[in-house]
């Protein structure tokens, strides 16, 4: 089975699990959901093949879990403005495994702690808890790829910049610089993460 096929299968299984366990899930099988699934699977499989094709298969699995996590979270955030807590633990565990498999300097560990404190005490007030947890999980993968605190903050800035540009083009920003209508933030977090892995 190809990486794309495996990611599509795992993503569908996770969505099926969410539908079965949450009676008020609100997820719809529509054109937009299909586009999110295909885009997420192509982006995940493409990234794994291009950036990690020659590495150990365990590295592929770690990034596959991240790709499934982000694809499902983008779909649920887009359709229901919900990020399921049950998805956080597997993605965080595999991100931690990545940090343990690669030589992460002490500055990387300090960056994770500092970033976590910034998220919990400052930034989560600007956006939802699910978005904050996604930034936290992304930070594990960024540090595992050799990133620093500056990289983590740059990822946040890029996500906000991408959100701002797209919403400006859509005419969803008022004169004070705020969003007229709230929009899901997780798609912008996921897209900007590809630049920093």
List PLM regions with ranges.
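A membrane-topology feature that recognizes alpha-helical transmembrane segments
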Residues: 1-197
